[in-house]
Amino acid sequence: MKVSYVLFEAKEKAVLITEDFDPSLQPNEVLVKADYDLISAGTELANYHDLPNTNVFGDDRGIYPRWPGYSVSGHVVSVGSAVTKFKAGDNVVVPWSGHRSWFKKEEDKLFLIPEGVSQQEGAVAHLASFPFLGVRKLQIQLGEGVMVAGLGLLGLIAVQLAKLSGGYPVLACDFSEERRKLALELGADHALDPREPDFIEKVKSLTGGNGPNAVVEVTGYLSGLQQALEYIAPMGRISILGCTRISDAPINVYRYIHGRGIQIIGAHTMTRPKQESHPGYWTEKDDYATFMKLVKAGVLNVKPLINKIVSPRQTPEVYKELGFSKQPPLGVLFDWTDFE
């Protein structure tokens, strides 16, 4: 039996590897065949380009190979003798496991995709748990103004979650006109270009004069955080959801944070609880469950976020397009359905 997987062999060199695979299972393991697999462009391109701060536990610069990918949907092919939660034919989320065609996973590492949620939607579940965390940590109150800065996959999901949480108005900003239009279609009340000369004044005007009470910062750039500090309301909260990997500018902490009572909240997914959820801090699996409920009910829409589906056989070309194109696709799925 063979398994195929995506590998970053070196900086800016992505390849598809095929090698032997042993499908035999331990009693608590599940054999899963991948169906669809979402590329997390921010994280994966940071690793592809060998940027700093790609690992919260240390500096990985210059260290290859790397195994990208962590948001997969698949179906159960067989189960070990002690498995009780899954059976052959079940559709499942496979988190933190790379872009690959086959998996052997302990049953407590998987999550069931219910009927009414497609495999393409299910492939978004793990990545969607990141903006769930970023929005939950803000603990948005009904009627609070919210800004989502940066409209990649995470930001466009965060726009919908901020709206569902009772934020009003919900503002969104991004350089891309196409993404601003999509944010409006998905529920944003206003969408702005942060390069506009009167951007700060517009944001404040649209939120009653003071600025938004809560900001989901997903640009990944320190300049985006600086801008948020200039338009946020006094006593406001900023959730750092995007990974700001390069600290390339000073911030006047006294003027923009200390003196105005601003809360800066780290919202990296590694900061969530492992076992029990509590207000503002939910486990991954509880966020997966909420994602499934909202998608199934039609109140969270991730279908418009996927605008390209490709074969893993196109791995080198896909990462070159994502890494170097001036207008890269928003959401890219690997389609593993024709791999044996």
Where is each model-derived feature located?
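C-terminal hydrophobic helical "lid"/dimerization subdomain
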Residues: 1, 229, 280-340
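Short N-terminal strand-loop motif that marks the start
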Residues: 1-64, 68, 335-340
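A generic structural signal for residues embedded in beta-strands
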Residues: 32, 94-95, 148
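A structural motif shared across PLP-dependent enzymes of the aminotransferase-like
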Residues: 41, 95-107
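A glycine-/small-residue-rich N-terminal strand-loop-strand element
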Residues: 72-96
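Mid-domain Rossmann-like dinucleotide-binding core that forms the NAD(H)/NADP(H) cofactor-binding site
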Residues: 118-197, 201
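Glycine-rich phosphate-binding loop and adjacent beta-alpha segment
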Residues: 223-293, 297, 336-340
